[in-house]
Amino acid sequence: MRPPAFLLVCAALAVTAASFQVPVCAQTALPDARAARAYQAARQAGAPALRVFLDQFPKGAELHIHLSGAVYAESFIREASEDGLCVNPAALSLAQPPCAAPLVPAAQLSGSLTPAAQRLYDRLVDAFSMRGFVATSGFSGHDQFFSTFDRFGGRGQRHAGEWVDEVASRAAAENEQYVELMETPAFAHAARLAQENPLGLDSSRQQDSSWQQDSPLGQDSSREEFARYRQRLLDLGLREEIPADREKVRAAEAQRRQIEHCGSSQAAPACQVQVRYLYQVLRGFPPGQVFAQARLGFETIQASMDAASPDSTSLDAADGKARAPGFVGLNFVQPEDGFIAMRDYTLQMKMLDYLHSVYPKVHISLHAGELASGLVPPEGLRFHIRQAVELGHAERIGHGVDVMNEQDAPGLLREMAQRHVMVEINLSSNEGILGVKGAEHPFPLYRAAHVPVALSTDDEGVSRIDLTHEYLRAALDYRLGYRDLKQLARTSLEHSFLAGASLWAATDSFTTPAAACQAQPLGGDKPSPRCKSFLDGSEKAAAQWELERRFRAFEAKF
């Protein structure tokens, strides 16, 4: 049967890649519908045209991004030159001065470069990122990705505010409004305490097969041991590092605000991007050190959450007023396939189970399921995500790539949907590290099972991408519609760790707003007094209202 004539006319008048003008017959439709037609027309015009459309599409939040991995290689090289650091041409890494041969002063890689200096500069950018990487026998994308951090790392915090500014500026340019940055605060004191006072449950005494679900690690008796160990660490002064950890964030935020001229008439657009922090715990250390660092993380986050004074570690860059704690949650990081990470996985989830009972208000997001067949034995693919949800109390899962290898995967998907456990989807990272892409990725399976998902970049500097790139990739690879993209953006803020109630009456159901804000245009400039009072009392709802305002502004263009 031939399509109706008006559809043929609309097709003939379809949007051009240059202007994205909506067909005349669609201009009387609702703004959402007009934007959807423009989106489809841009898709038909090809990836470059769709990139233009998606660049200014409101994206809400970026929830899975490591600060060190978010910075582009060029920034690290420039800062190394400013700091008088050296370059090791053989290792393609930065080094401390003096720059005696074979080391080369990083300053030689700025200004007018000789051909040799340009070649070294290019090799450094490649070594600090996935640019141009081609896997070879014995050196995979996984190896390249994680080796980059050793090459540009260990440089102190002098430029931390510049790194946050780089992330916020990029976010503002592509219409993001909120970012949760993962960062590892200092924990040398906690690590030393753990080394001098090892945890009684030493998993190194167990056999190497201890990553299986029936592992003897972390049995019920460990809970009492954790309680005793927690108190011992407190008695030995574990809390002494908390002020320094919070000051690190405060100083970075202050430097960022200065760079962006926030609060002045010259304020940069990045000032409007809210930034919060997730406390990274390194999972590749012995049990006592992991527990001590996690314990310090929970204490630091709780202290930040409890802080109500103007010297709180969190300043929203736009006006400098204290809004909410700098640290809003905790995450476990480092390669999940590492020996200790695999051996101690259940034990570490038991640690989180105990610490959650002591600090129930601290938010938890966990890297889990960043694994693929062949990377570890099959037994290692069968329980990480489930244990992160059920033992680790994860509200969000980072990656979740091996979910269909989990024992009773359909049941796990149902459980995640029922509990509204969101999955942070990192498409480019998963391809680069695990070689998983397209139909092999579980992204569409999560969506089909009604598990909430949102897009994120993981390490946009290392991967040489941005969040728009991930939206473009998802749109093309999985044939997403315009309203699918809106749901992804809304889901990101719905599952952010911002304080307060959601704008929406039911979790992950973006149809009916909370009672206080019903019967009025969402995202309007003048919410009712009752709605305004509700928004003023909830950071999350206020951010969600702003997202709806941005949708209205974006869709009004079509």
What are the language-model segments listed below?
Residues 19-25:
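Membrane-interface motif at the C-terminal end of an N-terminal transmembrane signal
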